[in-house]
Amino acid sequence: MLKKLIGLLTILIIAVGFCGCMEQNIEKQTPTASEAPNTIKVVDLYGREVEVPKEVNRIVCCGPGCLRLIVYLNATDKVVGVEDTEKKWTPWTRPYRIAHPELANLPTIGQGGPCPKPNPEAIIQVKPDVIFVTYMPKDEVDALQQKTGIPVVVLSYGQLATFNNEDLFKSLELAGKILGKEERAKEVIEFIKNCQNDLNERTKDIPDDKKPSVYVGGIGYKGLHGIDSTECKYPPFVAVNAKNVADELGKEGHVFVTKEQILKWNPDIIFIDEGGLKLVVEDYKRNKEFYNSLKAFKNGDVYGLLPYNFYTTNIGTALADAYYIGKVVYPDRFKDIDPEQKADEIFTFLVGKPVYKEMKEKLGGFKKLEFSS
């Protein structure tokens, strides 16, 4: 009996010891909160693997449209420095800057502009956790990361900077992941896609022979231009399935055309990007015969659009323009739409405030354009 008892005690002691060893091993294998990795690896739009902090509280943005995406994500509180262009350029063509004047009070971290030139020393001084960039060559991106010792993440609007492309959506998702704004990124993407779907559903079944022909002039392209500056596959036209005469050229993106070509097309309706409206008005005074030969001018079918392509694509403005174009071209399909109210609905969602009134005061807004003969 004693031998059995001793045997049982021995087994029990061995079992307890074994459990203790197992517990110690588990404790050793499970990192404590202080030992857990505090960085994550992400892949940016250049396909670069970048290691960023798990929690990002301070950021800067360099390049056309970069800051806009951060505003869309409701993350302006994390921005600790901005480009000089964001301070010096008037904000009226950039709804995100109208809605957030406080951004102009932040330290300058570089020149900005079409060819962004970040200042590594200025960036280091504001101590960002992450640098977001757009439209910067890969070698310059790598050099900036090396000089600052701060992770640089590339975002993109896509090759043609339209407001419906996968690179744009991937950029929102990536920035959302880094900034802890994943849910907001999903909401923004869904909002843009819903607008696209709504515009398409209203117009997709209209036969081409029932559509008026349209043309847009005054498109900005590395500066301001007049009526000869247009765009093939103009995104707001594409959104409402409009019959763009310039699409006959078989190209995509910005083109300059001759006045003779515009006369040959003789579109039913002409839209003017208000960024170039002043040049069109001046040209009208010099070339009245040309303009008055166009049926759109003769019939009073010339309308103003808000310029949306400034420091790359202002997504909200492009969508608002598309709704206004739909209202003009297919009034029966857009009976329920007030373009000005729709614009403010879009701006409020994307940038946090209704800014159409300010844009209208400075740029002209949605209206029929009058040309005195």
From Swiss-Prot:
It is a lipid-anchor. SUPFAM superfamilies: Helical backbone' metal receptor (SSF53807). InterPro entries: ABC_Transporter_SBP (IPR050902), ABC_transptr_periplasmic_BD (IPR002491). PROSITE patterns: FE_B12_PBP, PROKAR_LIPOPROTEIN. Residues 1-20 form the signal peptide. A lipid is attached at C21 (S-archaeol cysteine). The keyword Secreted does not apply. Residues 58-333 form the Fe/B12 periplasmic-binding domain. It comes from the Archaea. PANTHER family: MOLYBDATE-BINDING PROTEIN MOLA (PTHR30535:SF34), VITAMIN B12-BINDING PROTEIN (PTHR30535). This is Uncharacterized lipoprotein MJ0085. It comes from Methanocaldococcus jannaschii (strain ATCC 43067 / DSM 2661 / JAL-1 / JCM 10045 / NBRC 100440). The lineage of its organism: Archaea, Methanobacteriati, Methanobacteriota, Methanomada group, Methanococci.
